[in-house]
Amino acid sequence: MSLPLPSHMKSVFLGMKVEISTSVPVTRIGFWRKSVDCKESRIGKQPITVPANVAIAMEGQDLKVKGPLGELSITYPREVLVEKQESGFLRVRKAVETRRANQMHGLFRTLTDNMVVGVSKGFEKKLQLVGVGYRATVEGKDLILSLGFSHPVRMAIPDELQVKVEENTKVTVSGRDKSVVGQFAATIRSWRPPEPYKGKGVRYVDEVVRRKEGKAGKKK
């Protein structure tokens, strides 16, 4: 005795197509804005000591500092301000509470402090020439470097810098602008960076050169 099949089973056996419709709930997506936590810069909040022999002049977003070694100036972005306190300190503070202002706060505090130190004490970079026949001399406003090339390297010394050579292999670059001092010293080094096998080249006095063992030294 055969039992009648349900209607939905008949469609399977008879090859009938069954369309199944489903309803998918639509969810509305909302966006939320993340608040930015603008913490005060640890460096930016530190006051800047101004020596007695340094004069400060402020006009709007412009600051000028003048000392025994010369004069430097800087223009601040609108995100930061500089204030001269009665105690004689300079303080850089944020004008607005944004992430960019937080970044500018510490940067311009450092730049301002470098200016004050630069016009009062100055900055210097010392380099050492290592290699047979490597030597340096100063001729007028030019620094002459003999570094194993077919011709000596001649570098014009910027007006705001002083370059001194001792024992033909020790070069001292000094000046009031830290960035200019660093850039000129880096250019000197770039002519012959210290190579890692014998250590020949131009290096900073306090630079540690990582040495590599040559292939001959690896053979047992």
From Swiss-Prot:
Record keywords, A-Z: Chloroplast, Plastid, Ribonucleoprotein, Ribosomal protein, RNA-binding, rRNA-binding, Transit peptide
Domain of life: Eukaryota
Broad class of where this protein is predominantly found: plastid
Annotated compartments: Plastid, Chloroplast
One term of GO molecular function: rRNA binding
Family statement: Belongs to the universal ribosomal protein uL6 family.
Role of this protein: Component of the chloroplast ribosome (chloro-ribosome), a dedicated translation machinery responsible for the synthesis of chloroplast genome-encoded proteins, including proteins of the transcription and translation machinery and components of the photosynthetic apparatus.
Official protein name in the record: Large ribosomal subunit protein uL6c
Gene that encodes it: RPL6
